[in-house]
Amino acid sequence: MGMRMMFTVFLLVVLATTVVSFTSDRAFDGRNAAASDKASDLISLAVRGCCSHPACSVNNPYFCGGKR
């Protein structure tokens, strides 16, 4: 194999590695965003549950629609 051919193979390997790394990173970011949305939903459910109890809503007026 000549030097030019070896260099071409090297470039192809680097390109393939970059493409695989980039696509797997984007998929990972999507999973993180989904987990973050799920956490936000759980937090909002917990806050709504707190607001339905008078003692909790008095202690957390900012979350339950009251003035701070």
Swiss-Prot record:
Cellular component per GO, a single term: host cell postsynaptic membrane
S-S bridge residues: C50-C56, C51-C64
Record region (Ser-Xaa-Pro motif, crucial for potent interaction with nAChR): 52-54
Domains as described in the record: The cysteine framework is I (CC-C-C). Alpha4/7 pattern.
Residues modified as Cysteine amide: C64
Any Pfam family hit: Toxin_8
Record-linked InterPro entries: Conotoxin_a-typ (IPR009958)
Name this polypeptide is given: Alpha-conotoxin-like Lp1.2
GO molecular function: acetylcholine receptor inhibitor activity; ion channel regulator activity; toxin activity
Tissue distribution of the protein: Expressed by the venom duct.
Compartments it resides in: Secreted
Propeptide segments, given as residue ranges: 22-48, 65-68
Record-stated family: Belongs to the conotoxin A superfamily.
Function of the protein: Alpha-conotoxins act on postsynaptic membranes, they bind to the nicotinic acetylcholine receptors (nAChR) and thus inhibit them.
Lineage: Eukaryota, Metazoa, Spiralia, Lophotrochozoa, Mollusca
Keyword terms, alphabetized: Acetylcholine receptor inhibiting toxin, Amidation, Disulfide bond, Ion channel impairing toxin, Neurotoxin, Postsynaptic neurotoxin, Secreted, Signal, Toxin
Signal peptide range in chain numbering: 1-21
